[in-house]
Amino acid sequence: SSFCRKKLKCVIVFLCPFLWLFGLHGSAMVNGLVSPVLQANSLANAEILASGQELTVANGGHIVTQQFLDQFMTVTGAGLTLGAVFFMTVFAKSKKYRELGNLALLPAFFNINESIIFSTPIVMNPMMAVPFIFAPVVSGLITYSALYFGFVPLFTAVQVPWTTPPILSGFLVGGVPAAILQGIVLSISFFIYFPFLKKIDSANCKKERQRSEERRVGKECRSRWSP
């Protein structure tokens, strides 16, 4: 039913990043709950297409499928953290976040982001919880709308491994429109993370300067009192 589909979408959009905030592997836990339904939806879409009908919502096509989760809700990792990684790599001023961004950049392109989740940290961090949950919500709304109104074709049984890099994975499951949509939601994720990361990066810069000053004073004291 329509009500059940809406509940399923809410579970996917909210529960996955929410569990990660407490250090639980939200992606694995949510996948275990919803993957049978999502894959059944993908197969149902394939059957509609195989029957010679146009694959549309009006003809009974499903929007929320395994590809919806893997290629749009958790692309580059739970929370769509490529936007955060890009900020750290390009715009961060603190040594900690520049190094973390450089370390996390390559894994992010294979949808692996534990280094960002645990080292930023996002886990148990109320400030970072906001963009971490909000980015998938925005992605979900945009993707759902694009599929509903036919800007992107509904997904069929074509699936790719979850480690397939973004843009390529979108192209493989939904052609050029899906690849473009991935680029759009990932670009938006950068702007969602930007103000929050800018604030914690500035705070970390101050801490680094304080530690540097403390070390400098300590060295001066030791040299002054050394025989």
Task: Give the positions of each predicted feature.
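Short, surface-exposed helix-loop/turn micro-motifs enriched in polar/charged residues
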Residues: 7-10, 97, 130
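Positively charged, low-complexity/disordered segments
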Residues: 213-214, 218-227
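Generic multipass alpha-helical transmembrane bundles of integral membrane proteins
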Residues: 1-91
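Membrane-proximal intracellular helices of multi-pass ion channels
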Residues: 82, 94-104
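Transmembrane alpha-helical segments and their short flanking loops
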Residues: 46-65, 83-85, 103, 116-216
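Contiguous, well-ordered alpha-helical segments that form the cores/surfaces of helical PPI scaffolds
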Residues: 16-17, 105-107
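Short, surface-exposed loop/turn motifs that are enriched in glycine and acidic residues
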Residues: 71-76, 106-107, 119
